[in-house]
Amino acid sequence: MNDIDVRRFVDINIKQHVETQISGTRDTLVLYTHEGTFGKISGNTTTNISDDEILASWAAASAIYPAQTFPDTNAYLSMYFQNAGARVVVIEGVDYTDLTADMLKSLDNKFILVAQCSAKANVELAYAALKKIATTRETDKDIYGVNEKIIFGRTMTATDTDVITNFASKYSKVYGAEMTMAAYLSGIDVYGVSTVNDYMYTAESIDEEVLTDELYETLSLNDINVDTYFAGNVRDLGGNLKNGADLTNSYVRIILHQTLTDRLLELLVTKIKNVDGVGKIYATISKELENYRSCGYLSTDKVWTDKTMTVTANGKQYTIIEEGTPLTNGYFVQVLPMSALTENDRAARKAPPIYVIIADQYGIRAITVNGEII
């Protein structure tokens, strides 16, 4: 009998398909510090952040940044990890006067959380510098969706009335107190079940602020977070960014942009076509949004109360969503037909326009009970 390999004629090799893994967490804080050597990241001489520069425990972080040599950085890292912070990257030798909006822009999109450690005497100056960077980013037309970041700062000025997007403020006498906010967000996994919750009332490991009702009212009106003793523990009161947006929801919205982008890029490389491709796009978006419903980010009891939304594409008007439509899934996806594409769109191989409306969760922060005694 001959010994010819049968694979010369019929060659079959069916393997188990392994799906691309897309992470539901963005759990790494980038901490710039005035201490250390410029050009070092987490103790390593490098300009790029790799897994080697990501510190995943207090033991690892304090070994590189001991209190004797790096007292300020150590204090910040201690606050982060004692409040269950997940992971951190430390970029050395960058004081508040050195940090720029371009530095943040150069960070990978997966690094959403940003803080800066300055000397104790410069806390308010650093706070002002961070607000300026956040304001610069807010007006940068190239920053939206996937490349947004949340910047954290600490102040002892309750009357800060500035309204700033993606800037989280904490009123505290405690050095590094803003790290509590970053630590909380770092623990959110959008692919979990009921893992997205309001930051308000979170118990934290930090010294409390003793507040008068008038002071709390001022902080609340100015969307400044504060830790005080409440309901048997030291807890955060506030839960918002400086523009009044919910801190948790804003963070998860950025992650949503990123994971949905990843899913659609994953779909694109399969070389989808025409009408069949449109169906796959719709299915991919809906499947990903289901994860955000499961984790608690999306609410299923909201209704589109605005006027009916319409758009005009390729000379024809299309209805996206009608007034009074309930968002029973927490989201509403509308994909326009192929006829909505212009000739130029077709030549560019574009998919038809897709509209996504989401209803984020509303965290209840106050309860009023009325009644009568008879």
Language model: regions and residue ranges:
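Extended, compositionally biased low-complexity polar/Lys-Gly-rich tracts
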Residues: 51-94, 140-160, 171-178, 187, ...
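Structured, hydrophobic secondary-structure cores that serve as assembly/anchoring elements
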Residues: 1-49, 56, 233-374
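Small-residue-rich
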Residues: 1-151, 232
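A glycine- and small-residue-enriched flexible loop/hinge signal that marks low-structured segments
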Residues: 39, 45, 101-270, 281, ...
